[in-house]
UniProtKB/Swiss-Prot annotation:
The gene is clpX. The lineage of its organism: Bacteria, Pseudomonadati, Pseudomonadota, Alphaproteobacteria, Rhodospirillales. The keyword Chaperone applies. Zn(2+) binds at C15, C18, C37, C40. Keywords: ATP-binding, Chaperone, Metal-binding, Nucleotide-binding, Zinc. One of its GO terms (molecular function) is unfolded protein binding. Residues 3-56 form the ClpX-type ZB domain. ATP binds at P119, T120, G121, C122, G123, K124, T125, L126. It comes from Rhodospirillum rubrum (strain ATCC 11170 / ATH 1.1.1 / DSM 467 / LMG 4362 / NCIMB 8255 / S1). SMART domains: AAA, ClpB_D2-small, zf-C4_ClpX. This is ATP-dependent Clp protease ATP-binding subunit ClpX.
Length: 422
């Protein structure tokens, strides 16, 4: 319906789709016989955009262009343009290698595995998860912290290939064209500078085990996982065409890079810039293979990851965008929770910037945003279900800083204000 009947609200207009009145939404667009609000328009755009995603990453010859892949990544991941470009080109080249695999050619295209390095909460895992949504090759994510050498308690490296097989419905042909993302790769660094001090089954041992499957080998994969079923037949999977992307925070790597870059100059020409003033992401841009060796990765493992991409720290503007822009942005999530209580939730611009600055101070990146939001809204979410007539809750900078309570706007206040203005 477009208009209500009877009473003082005789001339009030309503959205024909969701039923909200003109006072509950920012904009109401009129058609010949219907009305639609800005929220319904935004929802329709999200649905169309989601359906359009799969067609964006396919071109005429089946190989998506780097620009198409980047365009989709931009919808989900804020900032990190360099890392997104590296991933877009790598995935594009991976598709091209697969399209050339069956053709006779003098030149064999070798794969270029990727290493993503960046501070915690900057979007490494989100980039991988977004790729998984948009690609039409099998994709799996593995956690390096659970891996151990074969024969020890924990997961074998073959379990990574098993997950890829499961993602391809046990189609070996499709699994051999897949992409694997290994998270927390920095956690398998060598635990000691002396390689012979003791057997390192979850550090250097895992690096050694990963070498062959990353370069290309025929791996024997138990279809039921583990070694508990000795009678089962093993599946043979060729890993030559599987692209490996590794990611890690590499905490402390920035100190190794800074130490390498320090000179012993003194006097008037010396650089007296405080190394602490440089942000982690800025320091990581100068990473060299020798820094990774000092961190604890073995030379052979570093050699299997020729493409190196570093991610930047998220600045204030990027964190504000993360709060509001993506489809599943935090602010939208909490607004949906408040809508279930028939209440609108709104944040002032200064409040969003204050939340972003708090997250930067905590050095937890985007991951710190949720805990800050929970702290701000805890009392409100506790009290709201027992309150009646609350139409809107407004959060400003003072609320984020803990100097004030959120502003509650009641429906009777808004009605009286409308009457006064009339």
């Amino acid at each position: 319906m477009s208009k209500s009947s009877g009473g003082d609200s005789k001339n009030t207009l309503y959205c024909s789709f969701c039923g909200k009145s003109q006072h509950e939404v920012r904009k109401l667009i009129a058609g010949p016989t219907v009305f639609i609000c800005d929220e319904c328009v935004e929802l329709c755009m999200d649905i169309i955009r989601e359906e359009h995603k799969t067609s964006l990453v396919k071109s005429r010859d089946g190989v998506p262009s780097p620009k198409d892949i980047l365009k989709v990544l931009d919808d989900y991941v804020i900032g990190q343009q360099h890392a997104k470009k590296v991933l877009s080109v790598a995935v594009h080249n991976h598709y091209k290698r697969l399209s050339q695999a069956g053709k006779n050619s003098d030149v064999e295209l070798a794969k270029s595995n990727i290493l993503l390095i960046g501070p915690t909460g900057c979007g490494k895992t989100l980039l991988a998860q977004t790729l998984a949504r948009i690609l039409d090759v099998p994709f799996t994510m593995a956690d390096a912290t659970t891996l151990t050498e074969a024969g020890y308690v924990g997961e074998d490296v073959e379990n990574i290939i098993l997950k890829l097989l499961q993602a391809s419905d046990y189609n070996v042909e499709r699994a051999q064209r897949g992409i694997v993302y290994i998270d927390e790769i920095d956690k398998i660094s060598r635990k000691s500078d002396n390689p012979s001090i003791t057997r390192d089954v979850s550090g250097e041992g895992v690096q050694q085990a990963l070498l062959k499957i990353m370069e290309g080998t025929v791996a024997s994969v138990p279809p039921q996982g583990g070694r508990k079923h000795p009678q089962q037949e093993f599946l043979q999977v060729d890993t030559t065409n599987i692209l490996f992307i590794c990611g890690g925070a590499f905490a402390g790597l920035d100190r190794i890079i800074s130490a390498r870059g320090k000179g012993s100059s003194i006097g008037f020409g010396a650089d007296v810039r405080d190394p602490e003033a440089r942000r982690t992401g800025e320091v990581l841009r100068a990473v060299e293979p020798e820094d990774l060796l000092k961190y604890g990765l073995i030379p052979e493992f570093v050699g299997r990851l020729p493409v190196l991409a570093t991610l930047d720290d998220l600045d204030e503007d990027a964190l504000v965008d993360i709060l509001t822009t993506p489809k599943n942005a935090l602010v939208k999530q909490y607004q949906r929770l408040f809508e279930m209580e028939s209440t609108q939730l709104s944040f002032k611009e200064d409040a969003l910037r204050c939340i972003a600055l708090k997250a930067i101070a905590r050095k937890t990146g985007a991951r710190g945003l949720r805990s800050i939001m929970e702290g701000i809204l805890l009392d409100t979410m506790f009290d709201l279900p027992g309150m009646e007539g609350v139409e809107e809750v407004v959060v400003n900078k003072e609320v984020v800083e803990g100097r004030a309570k959120p502003l509650f706007i009641y429906s009777d206040q808004r009605t009286s204000a409308d009457g006064a203005s009339a």
